[in-house]
Amino acid sequence: QDLPGNDNSTATLCLGHHAVPNGTIVKTITDDQIEVTNATELVQSSSTGKICNNPHKILDGRDCTLIDALLGDPHCDVFQDETWDLFVERGNAFSSCYPYDVPDYASLRSLVASSGTLEFITEGFTWTGVTQNGGSSACKRGPASGFFSRLNWLTKSGSTYPVLNVTMPNNDNFDKLYIWGVHHPSTNQEQTNLYVQASGRVTVSTRRSQQTIIPNIGSRPWVRGQSGRISIYWTIVKPGDVLVINSNGNLIAPRGYFKMRTGKSSIMRSDAPIDTCVSECITPNGSIPNDKPFQNVNKITYGACPKYVKQNSLKLATGMRNVPEKQTRGLFGAIAGFIENGWEGMIDGWYGFRHQNSEGTGQAADLKSTQAAIDQINGKLNRVIKKTNEKFHQIEKEFSEVEGRIQDLEKYVEDTKIDLWSYNADVLVALENQHTIDLTDSEMNKLFEKTRRQLRENAEDMGNGCFKIYHKCDNACIESIRNGTYDHDIYRDEALNNRFQIKGVELKSGYKDWILWISFAISCFLLCVVLLGFIMWACQRGNIRCNICI
């Protein structure tokens, strides 16, 4: 008699998930190396090598520094009244005017850079009793000696240099930036030749601040034929405040003011070429895409940029745990469901069914559970980017030599921030990966439990992700299980009958083994009894003597 399990009265249904031959290794909270079917790289590690001029307005400084453009160096006149989102200073920038220094260079550079404009308004300062528009052979404007266009070099008139006292109120509703300077002659002779007094003095004040500078006369290294220097200073005058300038010599006077603006403009040193392209994020190495949450191209950035981290690679799992299919198995030879391994070749879904019935074998994806997993995973990358992308710029820090300790402290703080963000990135990605794997495992379990609840006593869990269905289940029946319309009551009697027949036959087949074992045991027992009886009989007849020695 044929077993019911071996004819067309039963079917097998397995549930499984997608797998690939070679997955991607990711890190989770509980495992440093776990293989998944798919993962997305989160660290941008290369730039385009060029700076894109859109959507940010890029101003190429060419051979001018921002401060030279601010002061009005003759070869930087093209930058007058320019505006920018990002001013790019080049490595070949140089000065071509009277040698100068800015005691608070970094602050002035940062202030002007963030303002994003060199808009200049000339004002009518009155300088009585002195000669204006001084020039130098170190600052040629064409063939003639010249000077910074935004500054006015005042010298003696005849043999006198009177005390100057000039006021300029700010009657506007915006801040005004005044640039002025103090000339340090190289010799006492030069001092008296230019300013009469043996020692000058310059005081610039507002209601909020006051600066008094006394020239430091002395020879310095020769630069462009000059051993004297000019020190550049700056003063911000708030609305309603007044600028007061008092001097008896050595004054490099302002010609007007720069209109200050507040914004997100900045400055960056870079030798990358500027090209016509679109990129939200700019680094000194060039523009980089901002579709990843992290980057390790450069610490210095401008725009909406990924967060800088030390890692070269961080992979976000965008697929499920990968368990490659055992290639030695056939479709339904000895294969198992998801508990043992995944299935390769499922191109239309992440989860699905394989079946074997009277009509043959087949496979189909479960789109609902697949879509549920995909919907939750798709938002992960955007959420990570939202958490990490900076909508502001990280400017480069500059300090003078005397501020070495501050520079060291700043470097320590920046390095610590990078270390913290690198650690945070590791933890964040590991947590997201753990959640993804748990999520995809959960969807598989949900589908399995949903199928179990439908089949009830009509099928038996085989323990490997498959069900043995104890009734005839054609393709239409299999489809009803997949789409959730299966009615177990229709097949209940048939399933119970087949189950009892199969179990009964299996039980009868099992009795043969028990009978064999029991028969063998009884035979051994009887043999022992006969042997013992023979020995006792022989002892009584005297044919066998047994001596016991103590």
UniProtKB/Swiss-Prot annotation:
Assembly description: Homotrimer of disulfide-linked HA1-HA2.
Residues in the Extracellular compartment per record: 1-514
Disulfide pattern: 14-466, 52-277, 64-76, 97-139, 281-305, 473-477
Record: glycosylation sites: 8, 22, 38, 165, 285, 483
Coiled coil region boundaries: none
Cytoplasmic side: 536-550
Membrane topology: Single-pass type I membrane protein
UniProt entry tagged with the keyword Membrane: yes
Biological function: Binds to sialic acid-containing receptors on the cell surface, bringing about the attachment of the virus particle to the cell. This attachment induces virion internalization either through clathrin-dependent endocytosis or through clathrin- and caveolin-independent pathway. Plays a major role in the determination of host range restriction and virulence. Class I viral fusion protein. Responsible for penetration of the virus into the cell cytoplasm by mediating the fusion of the membrane of the endocytosed virus particle with the endosomal membrane.
GO cellular component: host cell plasma membrane; membrane; viral envelope; virion membrane
Annotated site, Cleavage, chain positions: 329-330
Entry keyword set: Clathrin- and caveolin-independent endocytosis of virus by host, Clathrin-mediated endocytosis of virus by host, Disulfide bond, Fusion of virus membrane with host endosomal membrane, Fusion of virus membrane with host membrane, Glycoprotein, Hemagglutinin, Host cell membrane, Host membrane, Host-virus interaction, Lipoprotein, Membrane, Palmitate, Transmembrane, Transmembrane helix, Viral attachment to host cell, Viral envelope protein, Viral penetration into host cytoplasm, Virion, Virus endocytosis by host, Virus entry into host cell
Residues where lipid is bound covalently (S-palmitoyl cysteine): 539, 546, 549
Chain segments annotated as transmembrane: 515-535
Keyword flag Membrane: yes
Other comment: Major glycoprotein, comprises over 80% of the envelope proteins present in virus particle. The extent of infection into host organism is determined by HA. Influenza viruses bud from the apical surface of polarized epithelial cells (e.g. bronchial epithelial cells) into lumen of lungs and are therefore usually pneumotropic. The reason is that HA is cleaved by tryptase clara which is restricted to lungs. However, HAs of H5 and H7 pantropic avian viruses subtypes can be cleaved by furin and subtilisin-type enzymes, allowing the virus to grow in other organs than lungs.
GO biological process, one term: fusion of virus membrane with host plasma membrane
PTM comment, free text: Palmitoylated.
Protein family per UniProt: Belongs to the influenza viruses hemagglutinin family.
Stated name of the protein: Hemagglutinin
Subcellular location: Virion membrane; Host apical cell membrane
Pfam families: Hemagglutinin
InterPro entries named among the record's database cross-references: Capsid_hemagglutn (IPR008980), Hemagglutn_HA1_a/b_dom_sf (IPR013828), Hemagglutn_influenz_A (IPR000149), Hemagglutn_influenz_A/B (IPR001364)
Single GO term (MF): host cell surface receptor binding
